[in-house]
Amino acid sequence: MFLLPVVVVGVLAGFLLGGRLGRLADVRLRAPWLFYLAIALQMLAFPSLVMPWQAAEGIATALSVGSYVCLVSVFLLNVRLRGLAIAGGGMLLNLAAILTNGGHMPALPSAMRDAGLSFSGIHNNSVADASPNLAWFVDRWAAPSWVPFGNVFSAGDVLIAIGVVVTIAAAMGARLPLPARRATGTV
């Protein structure tokens, strides 16, 4: 899933709902290093064409699963931020699909065809599979052709996108039409 358009939508939603971009600097994440570690693990597992290495399949799978564990941990540690529980739920759906399908995210051939993709076997963290385990959690839909860097996506990706948009807009101080969490404790 390519997150840049989702971040842009989150910032636009924040502005439209009265938020300010400067408020994003006030957000304090717990264990942000886990987020950066997850990105590094993904880059090691699935290097771009400009990087001078190729990870062996077993190592790439272990690094990829490790990156998901780091990301889920970041979400759990920061669940107090509005919207992050939604994104974390999406990560858990994706992780469940990956773990029950041999360490790779299955993509339905029909979705790949609709996205203009064609590969057999394993490509980065995806594997073409017409009958995967947890079929509703796998990459089953294709982004429209007009979406930059369009690809296939899953129910987990949808939840991640919604959660990221809500988190960014809320962090900007937007007036969200969602119930605020009540403080607990004695007065």
Language-model segments: what does each one mean?
Residues 1-67:
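Transmembrane alpha-helical insertion/packing segments
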